[in-house]
Amino acid sequence: AMDTVRSAALGIWVGGGSREETPEESGAAHFIEHMLFKGTQRRTAQDIARETDAIGGQMNAFTTKECTCFYGRVLDDHLPQALDILFDMVYCSSFAQEAVETERGVILEEIDMYEDTPDDLCAEKLFGAVFAGSPLARPILGREETLAPMTGAFLKAYHDAHYRGDNTVVALTGSFSQEVLEDIRRRFSALPAGKAPAPVPAAYTPAFVATPKPIEQNHLTLAFPGLDYNSPKRFALQLLSAILGGGVSSRLFQQVREQQGLCYSIYSYGAGHAETGVFCIYTALNKETEAKALATIRRVIDDFLANGPTTEELERAREQSKANVIMGLESTQSRMSHAGRSLLFSGEILTPEQILDAYDRVTREDVVALAQEIFDWDRASLSAVGQVRTEEEYRQLVLG
């Protein structure tokens, strides 16, 4: 509860996401996310839209490789009705075949949009290569050939098998009454018991992949094995990422962009999954500056491995990360997201104080040891999109 607000954020989090799909089911989890807005046994799609607008609410959803989330934000007075709409959508969808045909076309357009978004495509091709042979390699949206045979009956069967009580978290933050809590408990207890099928484990394998696209800039993602999302080292990883590529004072931004003008955009990030992860450095630049930029990135990493961070860098990264936590948890929406994601993935919710304390406890030695664990050049990978070189040429540029 947040006593100083008049709104509430509500989310239904379903574990699994696209990584629970078989190759033939690729895209089903995301297809279902779309279909749950298209009508229930009690409401048409227009009813859902009109009722949501009538209470001044916002409803949306997203699918990742690990989960699907349906969420809404409303004034506290309208929370009971929002709760009814959301549970009706998520658990009583009609999966009408006519709506399936229409929505398939929408998703195919969404796939085309991603094909035309080179930074997203670059990451997707990277994951497809380093996790080849596992569900983590497949795109969340699926492909035209996997979506084509999906019917309403197929999607409903997939939904019923995966949307189980033991696989679901309901998160509520903001201003709400005890009656609303009781309503959630009652609805949640009525959900079918059981868990969804366990996902197939994935493991990182180094890979180089080049995807030709007729665009002006080349988009590069350099990657190394990372951490799973529950790793106790994840706070050290955040500080490492902040120092290397987390902002305008970071080493990569300063040395690749500010000092040499080799790119416009460059940053680093960690992508964690249940049992594995990837640490990525992304940049967008002209083909003529690729070689120099990649050499600079390697030099920055090797210098960090040899000398570690300065005291000033470490404290700046710590304060930056702690500020992001505090500012990020001041809205009902972000706090709901933190609670739902944490409970679904780790079974516990760390308080803001616990998170800040975890950052305070990270030492310089922790960050240096983690960098030495991650930055093994023999396990480096790269995805390139644009006016690309060959994969072997990129291998030579990265590995020397």
Predicted regions and their residues:
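Short strand-connecting beta-turns/loops that link adjacent beta-strands
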Residues: 4-6, 64, 164, 215-216
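Short alpha-helix boundary/capping segments
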Residues: 20-27, 228-240, 244, 248, ...
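His/Glu-based metal-binding/catalytic segments typifying zinc-dependent metallopeptidases
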Residues: 2, 11-13, 195-251, 388
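M16/MPP (pitrilysin/insulinase) zinc-metallopeptidase core fold and M16-derived inactive scaffolds
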Residues: 6-73, 246-262
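Charge-rich, well-structured scaffold segments of protease-associated domains
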Residues: 45-199, 210, 227-228, 236, ...
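Short polar/acidic secondary-structure junctions
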Residues: 2-4, 271
